[in-house]
Regions:
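Bacterial N-terminal signal peptides
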Residues: 2-10
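Short N-proximal segments of mature Sec-exported proteins
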Residues: 19-72
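N-terminal signal peptide c-region/cleavage motif recognized by signal peptidases
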Residues: 13-15
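Compact alpha-helical subdomains of small soluble proteins
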Residues: 51-110
Length: 110
């Protein structure tokens, strides 16, 4: 997890909040959320987990974003898309294998 990663989110629909930069803990939370969401969808698509497990993982993603990332939902979603587009699929799955437990400890949801 690169806690120093900086993410800029541009929202052309709302020029007042046109750019949002996340860094430090918030950037790390975004990366964790992306990792969990992508892994959930991928595993479910390969029939390695069921829909219920996928929904739990996606729910954890939402809670991480709600509790550990500031800004509007639109800003968070835009930043999450940037993280997704900057990370390769294999790198994201490797992140999951190495860092999932640490993410959940670093960004508790309960």
């Amino acid at each position: 997890m690169a806690a120093a990663a900086v993410l800029a989110a541009s929202l052309s629909a709302h020029p007042v909040s046109a750019a949002r930069t996340y860094e430090g803990e918030e950037a790390a939370a975004l990366r964790c959320a992306n990792m969990l969401a992508l892994t959930a969808v991928t595993l479910a698509g390969a029939d390695l987990i069921g829909d219920q497990e996928k929904e739990v993982m996606l729910g954890v993603t939402v809670l991480i974003l709600e509790r550990h990332v500031s800004g509007t939902w639109r800003q968070k979603k835009a930043a999450l898309e940037i993280v997704r587009d900057r990370r390769s699929f294999p790198d994201t799955l490797d992140d999951y294998r190495r860092n999932a437990a640490r993410c959940l400890a670093q960004f508790p949801i309960n």
